[in-house]
Amino acid sequence: MDKFLNFARKPRLVSILTLAALMAAFAGGMRIVRAQSTAPAVSSADSELITQFRRVEVASVSDAIEQITGKRMYMSHRMQPIFTSKFAGFARTVQLKKDEGNKDPEALSGMLEAIDQGSTDSVYVMAVEDGEDIAGMGGLMGTAMAARGYSGAVIDGGVRDVAYLRKIGFPVFATGIVPSTSVHHYRFAGAQIPLVCNGVPVSPGDIVVADSDGVAVVPKDQAQAVLSLAQQMDYKEHSMYAVIEQLKSIVAAVKKFGRL
């Protein structure tokens, strides 16, 4: 308990809500207590949209986006999960810029405040400038996100405290696992702004879908069209497995269903 109180005395490093979530998590073993949201409530229609996206495969989502928009909206092979997981949610974006050797105690406070403004069905999307060997997040931030009901996090940069994040079951995709810190090396550069994460443009409110195949980003104005097409693709592909086994021919199955 003393280490939490000492940590809390550092000016603005963590909010009361975040500290409460951390203390509750440790007091009750690994149980994460959900904090009251300060973000606008997710509508029932939006919640249902996210539920439906959780049920489709990222491969189908990626194909559907490309057919509808003509754009590649999937992240590269470097974006890897810390454990096998599947999630979807609305992008909550944060950007960090390099500021080597800064002694400003407020340099990263905006990053923490941005976390405390998220809620259920949020996906934390962070772009860390040249950040493959810098941990953009770790166990404390992951605990706060879990307490607030975030679906997961996608970090164009490193992640640390991986054993703890696995223990609490909070899913994170990142481009590396490293023990480093962003403190004194980086500065908060904005939240809820358009950014590029692992080569993919992401705007606040876009839908981020992740599974064992990787991460795809659905532009919010194309969400319903992409979902409908991805559902059709999933149905065809799942139907094809039995046909291929029965006929022992992928050529015949592709000809029948028109899906590859």
Predicted regions and their residues:
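Bacterial N-terminal signal peptides that target proteins for export
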Residues: K3-T18
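Intrinsically disordered, low-complexity regions enriched in acidic/Ser/Thr/Pro/Gln residues
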Residues: Q36-E106, K236, A242-I250, K255-K256
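General beta-strand structural signal in soluble alpha/beta enzymes
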Residues: M73-S76, Q95, V125-A127, A153-G157, ...
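Ligand/cofactor pocket segment of small-molecule handling proteins
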Residues: T143-A147, S151-S180
